[in-house]
């Protein structure tokens, strides 16, 4: 996305951001499950206004991190301050889909994922433009394609799929500048999602139920969003957890669970490779750099 900065030489450890020589990138992730709400009839929806404000705050926070960071090398500091890449991503996506009763591998689920990522991408760009007004433009702006009115994600070229006025974003960037070279990247969040108690990155839930063995015996751990759905359906009990565990963490062969519930509570191993790729594409359309993708195989998989 830049001219005359040399070749892309590396990625970060999980591959979601492509980097020029000496270039770092600060990452952060929003637990989107936290924005699920319920109306008086018990129907789930997303609090888009709250998500907008958090997206803007997170973008500002990540820009702050660049300026307060301690860098091991002067060359890294100089490159970080010049390109000012930040990567705001997501976690809790699969949990949010459970709450909304949208199957991860359905057309409706993929459309929602596109809508979600376009929303975060848009408001992160809005905030980065506001930061440029108050703090100064991206130092390497003149070396970027922003000055030509281009945006660093594929969705910008797909006008028929826009839900926001991306022409305004492009024009505002040309008029006011933009603070950050990138604003959106999706990391795997393998550790921080465990701390937050939600699903990782944009991935489907790996298993609905885990059996934990300890000194005094064993007990089941169930995905919290799946538990919520099962409780709403009056299906949450020890038997259903045992049956899911016997089916390798999947509810698909637990016949007494209604089909609509089974369709909503799909796991990574229930989804075909093609469906994984389609979900990935739904997010990638609105992401500035790339996405870390986890591929799961059964223990008896062969090459």
Segments the model singles out, each with a brief description of its role:
Residues 5, 14-19, 42-53, 76-88, ...:
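Alpha-helix capping and helix-loop boundary segments enriched in small/acidic/polar residues
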Residues 54-77, 81, 103-188, 259-263, ...:
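Internal maturation/activation junctions in enzymes
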Residues 31-34, 51-73, 94-101, 117-139, ...:
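Structural signal for hydrophobic packing residues in well-ordered secondary-structure cores
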Residues 1-80, 92-100, 198, 203-225, ...:
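Function-dense linear segments that define catalytic or interfacial modules
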Residues 1-5, 151-154, 250-255, 303:
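Short, solvent-exposed polar/charged micro-motifs at secondary-structure junctions
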Residues 16, 62-67, 162, 172-179, ...:
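Catalytic alpha/beta core of large soluble enzyme barrels
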Residues 29-34, 90, 187-188, 299-301:
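Short, flexible loop/turn elements at secondary-structure junctions
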